């Protein structure tokens, strides 16, 4: 997939990219490959692969969810900025917060957002378990996203505490997600969420199946969650 194909395929989904946005995606690709030589950001470095498996995949929640409002979005464990920064490029009015536990990735993201000229992007070098307990962060985001971070019972404990009442947690998963979702049902309920939709689609050029799970925050998350760092992984709610 080249940039023009990417633009056309997003247009078919109702997402129109400006010339500035196209240039930002091009620069994003260049910086990703450049910095990947110094640190492990991605195993995918060929241009068609990055455009399909990172950029197109990251924007895919917008095929099913309305990002046209000035939403506050938190991306947990975004790595090289996925999915939040491709979404930010497409929807510049989003207010984005990125939480990642590795300082070297934060350094890359700092450079990236400066180079791309992205405003209203805040970076936090934190564990999600700690970040979600901070006053002003807990239950304060309209949308929380996570892409390939952890299995559902763990992921829900890291992310749902950050979602405001009535807001949405968007979990981006591979093809096996529906089986995984069953494992996470108890955690979703305990943490105050309710699954409102699951959407499955195939990436362009048959590059793999993806499932996006939308969970709405219906009740406040009990104060004991998230538990201390490492506990959700070792003892998931099941």
Swiss-Prot record:
Disulphide linkage map: none
Similarity field: Belongs to the methyltransferase superfamily. RNA methyltransferase RsmG family.
Cellular component aspect of the GO annotation: cytosol
Positions of S-adenosyl-L-methionine binding: 77, 82, 128-129, 147
Family annotation (InterPro entries): rRNA_ssu_MeTfrase_G, SAM-dependent_MTases_sf
SUPFAM superfamilies: S-adenosyl-L-methionine-dependent methyltransferases
Subcellular location: Cytoplasm
Keyword Transferase: yes
Protein known as: Ribosomal RNA small subunit methyltransferase G
Entry keyword Manganese: no
EC numbers on record: 2.1.1.-
Summary of the function given for this chain in its UniProt record: Specifically methylates the N7 position of guanine in position 535 of 16S rRNA.
Main location class: cytoplasm
Molecular function GO terms recorded: rRNA (guanine-N7-)-methyltransferase activity
Keywords tagged on the record: Cytoplasm, Methyltransferase, rRNA processing, S-adenosyl-L-methionine, Transferase
